Curated annotation (Swiss-Prot):
EC numbers on record: 3.6.1.1
UniProt record similarity statement: Belongs to the HAD-like hydrolase superfamily. PpaX family.
Organism field: Bacillus velezensis (strain DSM 23117 / BGSC 10A6 / LMG 26770 / FZB42)
Assigned GO CC terms: cytosol
Name of the protein: Pyrophosphatase PpaX
Catalytic reaction annotation: diphosphate + H2O = 2 phosphate + H(+)
A Pfam match: HAD_2
Amino acid sequence: MTDKRVTAILFDLDGTLIDTNELIIASYLHTLDHYCPGQFKREDVLPFIGPPLYETFSGINAEKCDEMISMYRAFNHEKHDELVTEYETVYETLDELKKAGYQLGIVTTKLRDTVNMGLKLTGIGAFFDTVVTLDDVKHPKPDPEPVRLALSRLGCDPSEAIMVGDNYHDVMAGKNAGTKTAGVAWTIKGAQTLSAYEPDYMLEKMSDLLHITGVK
């Protein structure tokens, strides 16, 4: 299905454009093994991928939340370049969309410093007209605030935009802001889980966007 009304595409970063899953899992396990020895295994931390760190750690130990976030971020920074890669067809798709005149943005719950690390490592930063991070908003996804901020910066109406992501936070943020939405089938939580939130599209690979927009 082609939708030529679209003029802007917003992307989540982690798990959507770049594969940070192993980095996130390792960062959680490193932190939780210190504060909650023996209580968390790999499968236990998968639900933590997507929500803001504060939301996750405050639910585990409110008193130690800030300490846990600091430990997580220190480990995450240390191991970042070792464990992060871009997903297949991402670079080529962004390049094609940019050449075709689409406005592109990132809407993420990460802090700007780690966002910049990922963009630099994968070389995709130059494709984006705006990047909205956790530093920029009071209410992260699934609240519509970060999506609305990105659209405001781009001068784009929600009806002309697609929000792309691997997590229900992304789909719901787009819906709450009035955009179309696209889930990604490579989400670590499984495409079926994401489909339950009824995104308008489900991408099997990022280059599917070229067909949705009519670029190819």
